[in-house]
């Protein structure tokens, strides 16, 4: 894992690091399971002065990926709805309508919390499209939550870059375990909510 961290950190010195970050952030919001935070952190640690630029890039790509996820959910649901209703226990037109009503009532907060936490954001972007929540509210909640998440990380590195990098270098294994636990907890919460 340490070698992977060092390798990702080296991307900050290449012209491809920002591109990789943008692609990862876009893909993670719609279809890919790996969050962009580790790469964002690595790039920010590699070039602390560019941390806010990396945070802005990650936010923009993540919101765009969320819009793509929303579109996939909205466009593809009608192709699979009958399969879900007929073959997935607990999924019926009635339960779908009930969850859709909850999404409609709490649309901003569902997307805001999903975008801010380690929960798999793509699950919520796809389901936002499936449940046809208010699109401007979806975009607003995505911009605020993803921006807050990534700009806090970028701001911390911008302010305390060298000290933060030293702490990560000294306690790398501990941070890796904490991140892994948060990631597993996020997936567990999603599984429990189903």
List where the protein language model places each region:
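Membrane interface segments of multi-pass transport proteins and intramembrane proteases
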Residues: 11, 79-95, 161-174
């Amino acid at each position: 894992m340490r070698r992977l961290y060092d390798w990702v950190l080296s991307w900050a010195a290449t012209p491809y690091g920002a591109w990789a970050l943008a692609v990862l952030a876009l893909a993670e919001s719609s279809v890919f399971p790996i969050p962009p935070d580790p790469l964002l952190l690595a790039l920010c640690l590699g070039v602390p002065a560019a941390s806010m630029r990396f945070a802005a890039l990650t936010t923009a790509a993540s919101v765009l990926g969320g819009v793509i996820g929303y579109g996939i959910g909205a466009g593809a649901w009608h192709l699979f709805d009958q399969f879900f209703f007929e073959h997935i226990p607990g999924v019926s037109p009635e339960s779908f309508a009930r969850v859709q009503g909850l999404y409609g009532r709490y649309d901003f907060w569902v997307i805001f919390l999903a975008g801010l936490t380690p929960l798999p954001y793509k699950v919520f972007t796809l389901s936002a499209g499936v449940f046809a929540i208010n699109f401007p509210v979806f975009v607003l909640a995505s911009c605020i939550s993803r921006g807050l998440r990534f700009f806090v990380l970028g701001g911390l590195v911008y302010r305390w870059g060298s000290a933060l990098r030293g702490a990560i270098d000294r306690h790398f294994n501990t941070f890796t375990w904490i991140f892994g636990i948060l990631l597993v907890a996020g997936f567990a919460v999603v599984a429990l909510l189903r």
